[in-house]
Amino acid sequence: MAASTQCFLHQYHALRSSPARTSSVPSPKPNQLICRAQKQDDANNTSNAVSRRLALTLLIGTAAIGSKVSPADAAYGEAANVFGKPKENTDFLPYNGDGFKLQIPAKWNPSKEIEFPGQVLRYEDNFDSTSNLMVAVTPTDKKSITDYGSPEEFLSKVDYLLGKQAYFGKTDSEGGFESGAVATANLLEASSATVGGKQYYYLSVLTRTADGDEGGKHQLITATVNDGKLYICKAQAGDKRWFKGAKKFVENAATSFSIA
């Protein structure tokens, strides 16, 4: 008897911690050192010359401590900005679509593959198509994304975004899958925010399939409603590549999405 694929959503409360920030304390204003040459007899000339040189050295050293850090100075592991000009982020390129905008990884290429209803944009990694992003725009009668319910309830209404399993039938798969299930979806984080007067939902999901590779997929979803349209941006990467640097590109792409 055929059995359809099911995704089981398990909610995990992600703990957030704000990174510690250190504030720089301005160095005290260097004390002015005054050297006065006094007439001494010939026996003290050498001693006075040494004293003047020592005072001058202290004055220069104190002034150096009190001066501002040059833009050319670099933190450990960073290249020095010799000319003091602001560095440009060349890892991402701005993209302005019809009613939306986002940052796309510079080394990802446009793709013509259509996966979801209303899809208007798709980019993928040059070396691994599992790492990709897409934007879909569909009509809706909702006035706000909150009209879909909570972020978790919204995800249940658009669970097609998490992908479909090709196998249909009874099976007992290894890897922690329930009997008869060949796919799981774990909701790692769900949040909302107001940007430019619009409410946004942010979802982080880890999906796994019994026949999949990469150890699963990290899928980040950003969604909002504007002028009778539901805007969804989904960026993803395989679990292995996620921890090898893809996380940076997927997170930036998903969180940079907004209504233009």
Curated annotation (Swiss-Prot):
Presequence extent in this chain: 1-74
Pfam families: PsbP
Location(s) in or outside the cell: Plastid, Chloroplast thylakoid membrane
Superkingdom of source: Eukaryota
GO molecular function: calcium ion binding
Primary location: plastid
Gene Ontology CC annotation, any one: photosystem II oxygen evolving complex
InterPro entries from the UniProt entry: Mog1/PsbP_a/b/a-sand (IPR016123), PsbP_C (IPR002683)
Entry keyword set: Chloroplast, Membrane, Photosynthesis, Photosystem II, Plastid, Thylakoid, Transit peptide
Biological processes, Gene Ontology terms: photosynthesis
Role played: May be involved in the regulation of photosystem II.
Family in the record: Belongs to the PsbP family.
Record's protein name: Oxygen-evolving enhancer protein 2, chloroplastic
Organism: Solanum tuberosum (Potato)
Name of the gene: PSBP
